[in-house]
């Protein structure tokens, strides 16, 4: 399988490590059982018919394996994959260049597909449905559209915010799969597998501790494992023990529920500065010094999953569970009787 990356790479060493850890085939992919079982059927049927796989939309919080699965789909189809992202496709001409370069059965992977400009998105419609695109020749009064046929291909789109996709685009995906957070047991297995690939031993208790604080997210579990490996190597330890894992998590300020410094800052701000809410996400972003998109795509999904935050039409609201944990007692007069005169939840 040929892979061509069109996105700007992160640190080269980190990219190489990610590629080492990333499963290459469907049988190596952990979790999302119903999703992968269905994909196996769809891929097998497409190969039997010698057709391109139908277009696939992968949605869900970041770090759950959408990019990995896109590469696996290409591998299972025996196809090449070209990868880019929505923000990079700022002009229809950029997309046209990609589409005309595809061979029969190739996979085009667009990460953050919800961030494509509307004009570029509309350009995809005929490509997805009829495998053709219209190219404008010349300009002004002599401008004319020329129709070009392109090879049948599979578009795999990944999004953390499927609600931002337009209905016409969403309707053109024949396969729509949503990722769920992973259980601690599955994450423990992922950590154990990754430690073997990274050539570092790890105790099961240490793997369990890392898995339990990984927010249900394999990417975070693998990142925490790499940082624990750093601590182990500095201590000249051949195995990551539970003590080393705990030291790593403490130094990174990650608590028992996987909340980090920014999670706590967000909740502390909502509970104590905005009296439990509601507060608009724009105001919240300014208050904590973080980008609005980052709050919505990275932090909020897990805080909602963990039961600390609710989204309402009026803004973000802290739950009773959040008030119990994060209140400093200063919001008693603002929270509708949830607190007594001593600042305790009534």
UniProtKB/Swiss-Prot annotation:
It comes from the Bacteria. Its main location: cytoplasm. Residues 1-182 are annotated as: Large ATPase domain (RuvB-L). The keyword Transferase does not apply. Residues 256-346 are annotated as: Head domain (RuvB-H). DNA binds at residues 311, 316. One of its GO terms (cellular component) is Holliday junction resolvase complex. Pfam families: AAA_lid_4 (PF17864), RuvB_C (PF05491), RuvB_N (PF05496). The keyword ATP-binding applies. SMART domains: AAA. Its EC number is 3.6.4.-. Mg(2+) binds at residue 67. It catalyses: ATP + H2O = ADP + phosphate + H(+). It is an enzyme of class 3 (hydrolase). It is found in: Cytoplasm. Keywords: ATP-binding, Cytoplasm, DNA damage, DNA recombination, DNA repair, DNA-binding, Hydrolase, Nucleotide-binding. ATP binds at residues 21-22, 63, 66-68, 129-131, 172, 182, 219. Residues 183-253 are annotated as: Small ATPAse domain (RuvB-S). Gene3D superfamilies: 1.10.8.60, P-loop containing nucleotide triphosphate hydrolases (3.40.50.300), Winged helix-like DNA-binding domain superfamily/Winged helix DNA-binding domain (1.10.10.10). The RuvA-RuvB-RuvC complex processes Holliday junction (HJ) DNA during genetic recombination and DNA repair, while the RuvA-RuvB complex plays an important role in the rescue of blocked DNA replication forks via replication fork reversal (RFR). RuvA specifically binds to HJ cruciform DNA, conferring on it an open structure. The RuvB hexamer acts as an ATP-dependent pump, pulling dsDNA into and through the RuvAB complex. RuvB forms 2 homohexamers on either side of HJ DNA bound by 1 or 2 RuvA tetramers; 4 subunits per hexamer contact DNA at a time. Has 3 domains, the large (RuvB-L) and small ATPase (RuvB-S) domains and the C-terminal head (RuvB-H) domain. The head domain binds DNA, while the ATPase domains jointly bind ATP, ADP or are empty depending on the state of the subunit in the translocation cycle. During a single DNA translocation step the structure of each domain remains the same, but their relative positions change. Homohexamer. Forms an RuvA(8)-RuvB(12)-Holliday junction (HJ) complex. HJ DNA is sandwiched between 2 RuvA tetramers; dsDNA enters through RuvA and exits via RuvB. An RuvB hexamer assembles on each DNA strand where it exits the tetramer. Each RuvB hexamer is contacted by two RuvA subunits (via domain III) on 2 adjacent RuvB subunits; this complex drives branch migration. In the full resolvosome a probable DNA-RuvA(4)-RuvB(12)-RuvC(2) complex forms which resolves the HJ. Belongs to the RuvB family. This is Holliday junction branch migration complex subunit RuvB. It comes from Chlorobium phaeovibrioides (strain DSM 265 / 1930). The lineage of its organism: Bacteria, Pseudomonadati, Chlorobiota, Chlorobiia, Chlorobiales. The gene is ruvB.
């Amino acid at each position: 399988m040929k892979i061509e990356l069109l996105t700007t790479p992160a640190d080269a060493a980190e990219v190489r490590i990610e590629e080492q850890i990333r499963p290459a085939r469907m049988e190596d992919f952990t979790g999302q059982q119903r999703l992968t079982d269905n994909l196996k059927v769809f891929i097998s049927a497409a190969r039997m018919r010698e057709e391109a796989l139908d277009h696939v939309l992968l949605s869900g919080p970041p770090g759950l394996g959408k990019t990995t699965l896109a590469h696996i789909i290409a591998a299972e189809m025996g196809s090449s994959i070209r990868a880019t992202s929505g923000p990079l496709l700022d002009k229809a001409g950029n997309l046209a260049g990609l589409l005309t370069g595809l061979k029969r059965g190739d996979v085009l992977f667009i990460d953050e597909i919800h961030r494509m400009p509307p004009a570029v998105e509309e350009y995809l419609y005929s490509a997805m449905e009829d495998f053709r695109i219209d190219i404008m020749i010349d300009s002004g009064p002599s401008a004319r559209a020329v129709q070009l046929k392109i090879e049948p291909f599979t578009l795999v789109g990944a999004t953390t915010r499927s609600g931002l996709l337009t209905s016409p685009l969403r309707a053109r995906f024949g396969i729509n799969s949503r990722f769920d957070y992973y259980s601690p047991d599955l994450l423990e297995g992922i950590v154990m597998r990754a430690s073997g690939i990274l050539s570092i031993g790890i105790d099961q208790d240490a793997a369990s501790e890392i898995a339990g604080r990984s927010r249900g997210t394999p990417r975070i579990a693998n990142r925490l494992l790499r940082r624990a490996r750093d601590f182990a190597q500095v201590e000249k330890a051949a195995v990551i023990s539970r003590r080393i894992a705990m030291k790593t998590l403490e130094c990174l300020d990650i608590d028992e529920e996987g909340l980090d410094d920014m999670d706590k800052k967000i909740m502390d701000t909502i509970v104590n500065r905005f009296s439990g809410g509601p507060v608009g996400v724009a105001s919240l972003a300014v208050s904590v010094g973080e980008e609005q998109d980052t709050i919505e795509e990275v932090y909020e999904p897990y805080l909602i999953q963990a039961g600390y935050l609710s989204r309402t039409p009026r803004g973000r609201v802290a739950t009773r569970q959040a008030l119990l944990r994060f209140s400093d007692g200063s919001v008693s007069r603002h929270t509708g009787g949830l607190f007594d005169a001593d600042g305790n939840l009534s």
